[in-house]
Amino acid sequence: MQADFWHARWANNQIGFHLDEINPYLMRHLSRLRLQAGERILVPLCGKTLDLAWLAAQGLEVLGVELSEKAVSDFFEEHDLRPEIDQLGGFRRYRVAGITLLQGDFFALQAEHLAQCRAFYDRAALIALPPEMRERYAGHLQAVLPTRSLGLLVTIDYPQAEMAGPPFAVPDEEVRGYYAGGWRIEELERGDVLGVNWKFLERGVSWLNEAVYLLERG
């Protein structure tokens, strides 16, 4: 899956992965990240999610990373914000009070970019990637995060043979394999969500679960 794939999805407005509401799992479980006002949270592959503005409204400093320039521009335009724009290494950096978005390749992130991050929130990053990229993504995320970090991870699982992603099925054992080295993994929620996801029903998926994990690296 190349960068051109995602640029085309945004250019053609094929963004079914974008939610027009704050993610309810985030609202329920943000407190588990034990963040204080002013602390920084990373949102990888953030798109133009409404969660960015909601996190900032909770008093947090939000750092999003997104490949698509259109997604980043749309976010600020739709929130009537006028960001300061400059260059930070290989990233184009957009900044307003409480929110910084780095537009560019996630794999170009370096540890110094995340030095102030206490936690991360992944709702649409891991599940957006095919199997051959997920291990690389999880490995790079862990390599650049500070030593003591927490994470809130949302995944989906379904019979992958019944539908071509994205979003891709990420089973529990895969999550635990990616974060086996030094992370404590707690499953916070798991539930059947097929009935409220008509796109999966239309494509013949027989079951669909969503899971939420708290990750803590000690």
Swiss-Prot record:
InterPro entries: SAM-dependent_MTases_sf (IPR029063), Thiopur_S-MeTfrase_Se/Te_detox (IPR022474), Thiopurine_S-MeTrfase (IPR025835), TPMT (IPR008854). Its EC number is 2.1.1.67. One of its GO terms (molecular function) is thiopurine S-methyltransferase activity. GO terms for biological process: methylation; response to metal ion. GO terms for cellular component: cytoplasm. Belongs to the class I-like SAM-binding methyltransferase superfamily. TPMT family. This is Thiopurine S-methyltransferase. It comes from Pseudomonas aeruginosa (strain UCBPP-PA14). The lineage of its organism: Bacteria, Pseudomonadati, Pseudomonadota, Gammaproteobacteria, Pseudomonadales. The gene is tpm.
